Amino acid sequence: MRVDLFDFELPQELIALRPAVPRDSARLLVAAGAGAIDDRIVRDLPQLLMPGDVLVFNDTRVIPAQLTGKRGEATVGVTLHKRLDLRRWQAFVRNAKRLAPGDTVDFGNDVSADVEDRADDGSFTFAFRGDEPVEVLLDRAGTMPLPPYIAGKRATDERDRDDYQTMFAREDGAVAAPTAALHFTSELIAALDERGVARQTLTLHVGAGTFLPVKADDTDDHRMHSEWGRIEHDTADRLNAAKSRGGRIIAVGTTSLRLLESATGEDGVIRTFAGDTDIFITPGYRFRAVDGLMTNFHLPKSTLMMLVSALMGRERMMDIYAHAIAQRYRFYSYGDSSLLIPEGNTK
């Protein structure tokens, strides 16, 4: 499909630079099947789901993956985006013209890394020096890697270390937050428990590639980035059991959805998973695992706009986004959210 079919105009003032306070006071656009669009707030979620439904969260934890370093007199900006092993990371680099394998970049605070190679996509492999865990080094020298549409408008600060982390964050490794889950609070979870809505977690370490623009003119020509994920055996069993009882699987965030679909066979059975996924979901895809999605609002012509269009239909999504813009919903990572239930999965 043509990539420009997923384009829309977004007023810049609708890009959220800070999250709602409290988190569950954010607005929630609800689109169930072909019915009317409903304007709610995230705190209403228990009323919108049924007992036996399952919310699936991503428990990845965002690391301070944004680094500024020196190679000689030159300053370079480094954004880690994928762990290769305990000490080696792939990274995107700004001001990298003279950076070459064999160079050492000093990030200050006794943190440095050697450049091992440069990939065809322009990214670099860095090997961090020393014996301390890389996570300890990053806590000392790194900052939170805010998306470019926020970082281009304001500086990262200490608030972001909390704001850009979900309450479910357990497993270090993401360089972008699974932002739909940012809206949850302990009070909301308690209300969902009382309603009989279950929850499960998986891990997908979101990479900076999630923000890369689609440069191809046609979706068939786009090369999707890969990310590492894991679904435990017990989690898969509980999800399959819920499905067999008629419960709906509602992915909280596109990262949860992509991993669930990667782990599910044509028979609709969710299986254990541990490895990379580069699944690219576009209109025409047949969903095998999920019955609905809670997700924030996405960038024009992005792979995630294509994903939600696959779930709901492209024209339906364009109508939903037109409504969101007209009603002044706040967009992107720190913005409002939506609950999308495709035709046939409403109750």
UniProtKB/Swiss-Prot annotation:
One of its GO terms (molecular function) is S-adenosylmethionine:tRNA ribosyltransferase-isomerase activity. Pfam families: Queuosine_synth (PF02547). Its main location: cytoplasm. Disulfide bonds: none annotated. Keywords: Cytoplasm, Queuosine biosynthesis, S-adenosyl-L-methionine, Transferase. The keyword S-adenosyl-L-methionine applies. Its EC number is 2.4.99.17. Transmembrane segments: none annotated. InterPro entries: QueA, QueA_dom1, QueA_dom2, QueA_sf. It is found in: Cytoplasm. GO terms for biological process: queuosine biosynthetic process; tRNA wobble guanine modification. One of its GO terms (cellular component) is cytoplasm. Monomer. Transfers and isomerizes the ribose moiety from AdoMet to the 7-aminomethyl group of 7-deazaguanine (preQ1-tRNA) to give epoxyqueuosine (oQ-tRNA). Belongs to the QueA family. PANTHER family: S-ADENOSYLMETHIONINE:TRNA RIBOSYLTRANSFERASE-ISOMERASE. NCBIfam families: PRK00147.1 (NF001140), queA (TIGR00113). This is S-adenosylmethionine:tRNA ribosyltransferase-isomerase. It comes from Erythrobacter litoralis (strain HTCC2594).
